[in-house]
Amino acid sequence: MPSPPIDLTTLVAHGLDPALFCVDRLGFEPDPWQARLLRSKASQCILNCGRQVGKSTVVAALALHTCLYKPGALVIVIAPSQRQSRELFIKLIGFLQCLEPPEPREEETKLSLALSNGSRVVTLPGDNPRTVRGYSAPALIVEDEAAFVADETFDALIPMLAAAPDGRIVLMSTPHIAAGHFYQLWHGGGDWERYEHPTADCPRVSREWLDKRRRDDPLRFSREYECQFGNPEDSLFTVEMIDRRHNLVSVPLL
């Protein structure tokens, strides 16, 4: 039996409050910092977070809310590799499937989505700036694992927002080395709303689990779980190594 349509008052409330939308329609109860991000009006947000705090989950929800409540919106999701950008896209699709009544879709592929209201989601790899050219006036750009995306690619993203006065960009990552656009924007000035949340902030990750990771590799622990940037000479990571780490078993977020 089809679900009844959502009444206008509730629809307006969900449009105005993405955190309420997450609770009522996605079954996702945001942590306090996630609710703050969802309700933020800032056009530029940067998230320096430890692993498994829920940054991808909340940004996927924000991207879906943008698509639903801004008809004709273009959402661009970019990450160091195509597979990584698809991971956040999969989270968005998972949220989309939670909606009752269902949201009509015009087209869905492994790398993109088009809704009946004209909104689109496009996923792109961040290893080549040429792949991001050709898009304009996005409502939202999401750069996932931004510390590992090429600086030239980030430079190619920014001009897209010139024709989008209400466009937003969200950079999110675990830190890497003290270099590159993610590091510079995190520590620099500019009109960026900043969020820093080490993994210890997440109530779903146990202290015992974190203590074990710290004993295993203190240097990596400080970078991946405590939001600390490493020295450039300590860097041995490649995009392929970062891509492979996403295949590891993760602590459940929900």
Predicted regions and their residues:
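Phosphate/NTP-binding elements of NTP-utilizing enzymes
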Residues: 2-254
